[in-house]
C-alpha cells in the first residue's frame, strides 16, 4: 500500500526465496518485472525458474491454462534502441547488479520506466550505491527486496519495511536444514594446511561415492591465483576428473553444465 517504501522479506538461504518471488509475480499479475540478482550464476538460475514457473506448476499451485512468462536476461550494458526494445517485449527481465551498472543513463531510465515492479533477490549483496540508483527510478512503484540478513555486503543496513520475517530457528524446527557432519582437520604447520584439507575432502568423497551417494566436492578460493594453487592439490585424482573454474575460464557455461551432468 506504500509505494515510497520497499517491502523487505527476510528468509534464510535455502528456504524458498526464488519460489516466493515467482508466487508474488504470478499472484500479483505483474505486467513487467525487473529482477535484480547479485551474480551471473544466480541470474541464470532465476531465469530458468521463471521460464517454467519452478515448483508452482509441479505442485499444482497454478492451473494448466496459466502461461509461462516471456523471460529475458541482461548480461551486459545496452547501447542500442533495438536491444532495449527487444528486452521490453518480456514479462520478466533478470539482471545482475554489475550488468545494470554498465547501462548508459538514457537506456537505464527507459528500462526502469517500462518496468512496473522491481524485485531484488539477495538484497544484502547489492551495494548501497547501486541500490540508490535503482531505487530512485522506482520511487512510485512497488519494490520487493528479499534478503537473509538486514545488512548489506558493504556494511550498510538494508532499508525498507519488513513485511515478513522467517526466523532461522523456525526454519530449523520445520526441517529446512539437515544436520551438518563436522570433520576436523588438524595441521599445525600452516603451509601444509591446504594439503591436509584436500586429503580429508578426497577421503570423504571416495567414502561417499563407495556408499552410492551422488556427491561432489567444491573447494572455493578468494582469488583466481589461490584457486589455481588449491586446484593442484586435487589435480592428481584423475579418476575424479577435477576441474578448475573461475571468471576467466573459456566456455565457462559449458564447464558448469558438465559439472551439473556429473562429468566431473
Feature roles, as predicted:
Residues 78-119, 125-133:
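Conserved RecA-like ASCE ATPase "motif II neighborhood" in helicase/translocase motors
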Residues 20-23, 27-61, 130, 222-227:
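Conserved Walker A/P-loop ATP-binding site and its immediately adjacent core
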Residues 117, 124-180:
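Post-DEXD/H (motif II) to motif III coupling segment of the RecA-like Helicase ATP-binding lobe
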Residues 2-7, 30-31, 213-216, 264:
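Pre-Walker A (Motif I) flank of P-loop NTPase domains
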Residues 240-264:
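Conserved helicase ATPase core of P-loop NTP-dependent helicases/translocases
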Residues 162-235:
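Conserved interdomain linker/interface between the two RecA-like ATPase lobes of SF2 helicase motors
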Residues 41-77, 235-240:
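Conserved helix-turn-beta segment of the N-terminal RecA-like "Helicase ATP-binding" lobe
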